[in-house]
A protein has these predicted regions:
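Glycine-rich phosphate-binding/hydrolytic loop that grips phosphoryl groups
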Residues: 201-215
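Gly/charged contiguous loops adjacent to phosphate- or pyrophosphate-bearing nucleotide/cofactor binding elements
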Residues: 109, 113-172, 179
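Nucleotide/phosphate-binding catalytic cleft detector across ATP-hydrolyzing
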Residues: 1-75, 144-152, 165-174, 182-185, ...
Length: 215
């Protein structure tokens, strides 16, 4: 249960209260039982944990940001993992909807790795050298176009995920980005440098906040 209101008023302890109208916001995350069982078995064999719990990454990000930024009623969470990106839409302190697309930080490195026929670690090293301004002219010449390609592919999928919310007519202005430290700025800039006006009511650029250890 994310929130509960009685007669339009939000309450944390509704027990014993009387009301004419009850509204409950409930978030459910589902997964096939066989998938859960396989993951549970693998984790148990390796780590020997007494208790293993499963939760939604998007929901965890939402709860954390809601507590850290209590004045932000509505916002978008972009959580970039190794293989996937979660996009969460929060409205009025409630997780409204979530979407996942198969592009994460490793997708960037694979684009370079496959194009240059090098291993993934080498591709990561070259990508970070270019992003940090320490690459040679030759490396910039070969890697920069591939980084642009990876950015274009990621932005395209992010744009498509936003288009799923257009019918709601109220895409939030604030975007929180959670990403691996080495590519955090890269993902933030990927959103900042693109135009998503067609998805917003205000026709303003997104206010993109990179969430890190200093936040």
């Amino acid at each position: 249960i994310q929130s509960l209101t009685l007669n339009g008023y939000s309450l944390t302890d509704p027990i014993g209260k009387k009301a004419e109208e009850l509204k409950i916001s409930l978030f459910l995350s589902l997964s096939p039982r066989q998938v859960i069982d396989v993951i549970h078995e693998e984790v148990e064999q390796i780590y020997r944990l007494k208790k293993i719990q499963f939760s939604s990454g998007g929901a965890c990000c939402f709860v954390s940001l809601r507590d850290v930024f209590p004045n932000e009623e509505s916002f978008i969470v972009v959580s970039v993992g190794s293989e996937v990106t979660d996009v969460v839409l929060v409205r009025n302190h409630t997780l409204a909807t979530a979407f996942t697309f198969p592009k994460g930080s490793h997708s960037v490195y694979r684009t370079i790795s496959e194009s240059l026929s090098i291993d993934l670690q080498d591709a990561k090293t070259r990508a970070l050298l270019c992003e940090n301004g320490h690459a040679s002219a030759e490396m910039i010449r070969t890697v920069s176009p591939l980084l642009l390609k990876a950015r274009s592919e990621w932005v395209d999928m992010f744009s498509k995920s936003l288009s799923m919310y257009v019918n709601d007519l109220s895409i939030p202005h604030t975007v929180f980005v959670l990403a691996p430290n080495d590519l955090g700025c890269w993902y933030r800039d990927s959103i900042v440098n693109e135009s998503f006006h067609q998805y917003t009511l205000t026709e303003k650029d997104f206010n993109v906040i990179l969430v890190g250890s200093e936040t």
